[in-house]
Amino acid sequence: MKTLKYAWRFLIRSKSYTVINLLGLAFSLACCIMLMRYIHRELTVDTHCIDREHVYGVIQDMDGNRGMATIENTNKDSIYIDHRYIEKRTSLILMEQDFVSDEASRYTVRTLVADSCYFQLFPYRIVQGTPIKSPESALLTEVCARRIFGHDNPIGKVLHYSNGKDITVSGIIAEPTCKTMIQFDIVVSNTLSSFWERMPIEFVRFTPGTSIKKMNELGKQARWVNPNWKNIDARQYTFSFMPIADIYWEPAYVQDAGCPAMLTYGKRSHIYILSCVCLLLLLTGIINFINLYLIGTQRRGKEYGLKKMFGIKGTTLFLQILTENGLLVGCALLLAWLLIEITIIPVSRLLEYPFTYTSFDFWLSAGIWVILPILTSIYPFVKYNYASPVSSIRDATQSKRTVHTLSLIHISEPTR
């Protein structure tokens, strides 16, 4: 407690150095935290899937054009994939420019046509109502429900769907805490109609022990697009299975589906660049923090020298420096999160993703508060702990002009 009071008293007395150091570190941390949150979101896409490393999308290759498609098992020949190997299989149809209407208005929506197995592979939390139980049932996202019904209870409300049929809202689903590759507003059953305007895509989970290498070898065998019309249609295709976690990083496959508003993708090169920028910002902030801290403590060389003459232990000195840096980092973190909160709307628009607070934010802040004070305390501790008392006292007798000059140099230093 005495060390904490002493550290706080020093920071209050050195107001100019404290404020400059606090603001510099806060801006650096705010930028780094924003970037790390974005990188974390990109690396955890579709983690709501039951096992994104072992749920596979079907990638079809036809005349060099590769995209997401389905498994065709119409002919049970030597290259047929036995259904016994498939544990779960879901077929989806993406209706990007779709609409629903009520008595007053018409609403543009992104419709996901799905079967019941989709929610077994990609669980969503139902915050109100029940899952789809009939062909005429539909699920809405919370955002879509507010857009259409406002604050009214949407459960049981009837909407007129684009195919001419009426659908009843049976439930409201919450947005997952993670980013998802498939974006939608409304989910309807694939049994609502026997004919849809778009081709489906499929996701598959194989039974335990199934060799994905063997499945891909079967998929490499060329198949006829129209086996009964080979003389007229000479097109052939192959397919392969790719984990959900990898499809997101393949823009060509996602863009081939032709639904840019419903299928998102990422680029690894962007993650590498942003990671380097984040690291450079953090290093710049740490170096400037240490330099300014040393300027602020330069006058205390006499104090440290006298304490060493009276036998102060290195542990006590390190604890004192660590406490001061811990207080500064803690205050800088609070200010950084305030800056993040103020800028969250423009940043979300820039990065095209609405950020929400998750447990990652807590652990990130806790990690910074624990690790950063230790890193920034090592060099000042080594400088003063291993210097002779006479050297520390002599350094403290330098004129105030030197200290002020160093301060002006650091303050006027251009932003990196």
Predicted features, each with a name:
Residues M1-L22, P260-L263, Y293-L319, T323, ...:
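Alpha-helical transmembrane segments of integral membrane proteins
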Residues D115-V127, A138-Y265:
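Mid-to-C-terminal secondary-structure elements
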Residues T264-L279, L364:
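N-terminal membrane-entry
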Residues C32-D152, Y161-T168, E217, R416:
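Structured, solvent-exposed hinge/loop segments at the ends of secondary-structure elements
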Residues F27-C31, L35-M36, L327-I345:
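Hydrophobic alpha-helical transmembrane segments that constitute the membrane-spanning cores
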Residues V55, M199-E202, G301:
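Short, solvent-exposed beta-strand edge segments and adjacent coil->beta transition regions
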